[in-house]
Every structure is written in C-alpha cells, then in structure tokens.
Design a protein with these regions (language model features):
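Preference for protein termini
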Residues: 1-400
C-alpha cells in the first residue's frame, strides 16, 4: 500500500535487521500482558489511585469523569523500550496521545524485512503485522466517515492512514485543533469514526460540551489512555506494592520491575534525595516532563550542559521550578549496535516499539536508532525487526 514511499524511508534503515528470537518474542508478549493489566486497572480505578500519588487538575478530573461511565477501550498505545548495557529490555515510556502513532510507519520495517528475507529463499519469518492491519481495518466498524482531530504537532503518520482508510472507502477529513469546536456539528454526527491526534493541552482548552461529544462519538483513543497511561508518572506506580498488588501476581510485579527504569516524581518528597544527588552528579540521571512525547523537554544529564541542568532547579515567577513538572530516573547505560550509514560508521542505540491496540499486542514495530542515547534529539535512523528461530538468519542480524 505504501511501496511507492518505501525507497525514501529505506535510506534511513540499517542494513542488518534486529533479530528477535522466540525467547525474546515471548518475553515481550508477557510484558505486554502485564502492562495491559496495569493500564486497565489504572484506567478503571484511577479515582482510588490518583489522590496523593498523581495530582491532576480539576479540569482533567472532570474530563476523566466523562469517560468513566464507558467501558475501557485503550485504543492505540505504544510502550517503548531500550536495550540496557547488560542486554535487558527496559521500558522507557508509553506513547498513547496520537492515534496509530508508529503503527503505519512500521509498514516500511515490514517491507525492509521482506526484502532482507529474499536472501533466504523458501524460508519464512514470523509477523503479526498483517493481523494488525486487519484489526485497524475493522476499527471504524460500519462508519463511512472518518475525522482526524489534529494538533499542531508534526507527524508523518496521518498521511499514511489517510491512504489506508480512503482505500477502505471512507471519506477522510482532517480538522485542526483550532477548528474542532466550531466544526463539532460535523464530526460529532452519529456514525462518524473519530480519532484523536490532539495533545493534552489542546484537549484542556476545549469546553466540556465538546469533550462530552468526543466521548459520545466514541473517539479513539479513550481519555483515560491519553491522560493517564501516557503520563510518565504512571511508571512510578509499577514500583508500588499498593498498586501492583491490586492487579498483578507478585511474580508478574517482579517481572515488570525487572523491565522498567525506577521512576520518581520530582515534586514529591521521596524524590528529593535523588534530586539532591542529581544536582551534583547530572550524568547519572535523566529528567522527563510528565506528559510530553517525542523526547520533547527531556534532559539527559550526559547530554545537557551544566548551566542548563542547574537552571532546571531555578524557581520561576510562580515559585515552581522546571524540574517540578518532571519525573527523574537513573540514566540507563545502553548497548550499542554497529552500523554504517552513508559511508560513516556509527554505534547506534535502539529504541523498540511494542505495537498495541486495545487489549491486543501485535509484536514489535520498527526500531528507532541513534548514535545518541536519547532518540529524537540528534541523528535518527531505523532498523526493522525480524522474528525467527532460524540460526542462519539470526547470524545476519543484530540479535536483540
């Protein structure tokens, strides 16, 4: 469907795929199952969890209350993970603000994997991407009109799923964030398939009647996904027995914690020893805004100048420090993978995508790679996943 665009995207891809063995595949599938139980519990019981743990504004709580009367349907969400120096996979964030983010861009990774497999005639690889496309095709149900409510954030994904859904016979309309309220009578009609590419700031700026219309029309994704699951403070809950004991078995909680980076909320008391140490030893920590994505606002100590790092502790006119709107994590040393791109050698770090829709997991999407330990802040390349047990094929891959 997107083969005409493939030559452009292929120029950014590593020559060697990332090989995923059956053991890694099963590890990631278990990780999804555990994560989904946490996400579902948080979404359905946030009123018991939020007080004292994840402060939300009155407007946010009002928005969530609109959605709380509906069954939880996660929509599209994407846990991302990095590869630690010891080879373990470590969750670093969950992206769930924008519909289908990473899903259709991973099509080019599928093309790249197919091209690579031509070296091995008669052999196959395992992939759930076709199942994912079938699931995405079924999402509109019987709707013939599709509306994308979109923020000013840059994304390449919309033009891809526009083509995908137009080929299914849907009329496709994009409505920018400043037109959403004025055109509510258009997109909120019964029978519309409405998806959100809005960020939290956009949504918080709308009146409650508009937000209620989004719930009534069944907009994808669920507000609980956008405001709770995407929030990096959710990661702090994974390390709290009071939370995990209500949705996970002890062995599953231990499994999740072994695959996650310890996280604390900077404005809370238990983070203060970390913050004091981070102020003096920046290279040992990374700071991330609660709700942003695409590495926006991320301050990795080793990549941040000393004066810029210290500025995060300086109070503004309202008395709040920039760091007070962030989470803090130990900076994770990562394994690098050698590659040659445009004649130059790099040691790239990997960031993997777990492609999830509702309660389903469709295995790994494309890998984002960079010679910097934080993606999206410098050079940016890609690698395709290749799932196989074949030792000869794996010998030609960078094995995860």
């Amino acid at each position: 469907m997107f083969s005409d665009l493939a030559p452009y995207y292929f120029r950014w891809y590593h020559d060697r795929p990332v090989g995923i063995t059956p053991a890694r595949r099963d590890e990631l599938r278990r990780l999804h199952a555990v994560l989904y139980r946490c996400a579902e519990h948080f979404a359905l019981h946030y009123e018991d969890v939020v007080p004292g743990r994840i402060p939300l504004s009155d407007k946010e709580l009002e928005i969530l209350s609109l959605q709380s009367g509906t069954p939880f349907r996660a929509g599209t969400w994407r846990p991302d993970y990095l590869v630690a120096a010891d080879g373990s996979l470590q969750l670093c964030e969950i992206t769930s603000r924008f519909f289908a983010h990473g899903i259709f861009m991973s099509c080019f990774a599928e093309y790249a994997a197919d091209a690579f497999m031509k070296r091995f005639p008669g052999r196959t690889r395992e992939s759930r991407y076709g199942e994912l496309m079938d699931y995405m095709r079924a999402l509109p149900g019987g709707s013939r009109r599709m509306y994308v409510l979109k923020s000013a954030d840059r994304t390449s994904e919309i033009r891809l799923y526009r083509r995908f859904y137009e080929r299914q016979g849907l009329t496709f309309t994009e409505i920018t964030q400043d037109e959403v309220e004025a055109r509510r009578g258009e997109w909120a009609r019964e029978g519309s398939f409405v998806v959100s590419a809005l960020n939290q700031r956009d949504l918080l700026g709308y009146g409650m009647d508009t937000l209620r219309a989004m719930v009534d029309v069944g907009m994808v994704s669920d507000f609980r996904n956008i405001f709770l699951i995407h929030d990096k403070r959710f990661m702090r809950l994974w390390f709290e027995d009071a939370f995990t004991s209500r949705c996970l078995l002890p062995e599953d909680a231990a499994f999740l914690r072994a695959h996650a980076i310890p996280t604390r909320i900077c404005c809370e008391e238990d983070a203060q020893p970390w913050l004091e140490d981070a102020f003096r030893h920046k290279d040992a920590y990374i700071l991330k805004p609660w709700r942003l994505g695409k590495s926006e606002g991320v301050q990795a100590g080793p990549l941040t100048r000393e004066r810029d790092w210290r500025r995060l502790w300086k109070p503004g006119p309202d008395g709040r420090r920039p760091v007070d709107g962030m989470v803090i994590q130990p900076f994770q040393e990562q394994r690098s993978f050698p590659t040659v791109w445009e004649g130059k050698r790099y040691g790239d770090y990997l960031c993997g995508m777990m492609l999830c829709v509702d309660d389903r997991y469709f295995d790994s999407g494309l890998f984002r790679t960079s010679s910097l330990p934080v993606t999206n802040v410098g050079d940016d390349r890609k690698a395709c996943p290749l799932q196989t047990a074949d030792p000869e094929i794996l010998s030609c891959c960078d094995v995860l």
